[in-house]
C-alpha cells in the first residue's frame, strides 16, 4: 500500500547532550509539493522528532558535508549501495506510535527492483542527505504528530528560531503521544 507522502526539508536541528534529547524538526516543502497539494494544511506545520546526540551529530555532519579520515556509517552505507549498482530512491517517515517514529528506506537495486529497509528516522535522514535522496513523511504522521508552524513570512528568522528553541526546551517527548497510545 502506497502512503500519501509529503516532501519535507530540515527546519532545524537542536543538538543537546544527555539526558536531554536532541530535536530534529522537519517542515513540509511547498517547493517540492505536487502542484495543487501545496495548500494542504500540513504544509504550514513542523514535525519535531526527538533523537539522541550521536544521531544528531551524524545528521549535522551530513548537512555540513563534513569529511572524516575514515567513512562514517551513513556515508559507508550510501557508498555500499552505489557500489552494488543501486541507489537510495527515497526515505519515508511512515509511522508513529506514541513518541516513537518509524522510517523506511527505499533502495533501487541494480536490477531495477526496489527493496525496503526498516530504519530509525534519524538514520533515514542522515542517509538521505548523504545519498542525495528525497525525504518524505506520510501525511497521516504529519497530521498526528506535527504542530502549526509559528514562523510568519517576513519575520526575523533568527528571532523565530530562538523562540522555537525555547519552546523545544520546555517540552518532553511524552507531550506528543498520539491518540490510542
Residue ranges, per PLM feature:
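Divalent-cation
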Residues: 1-181
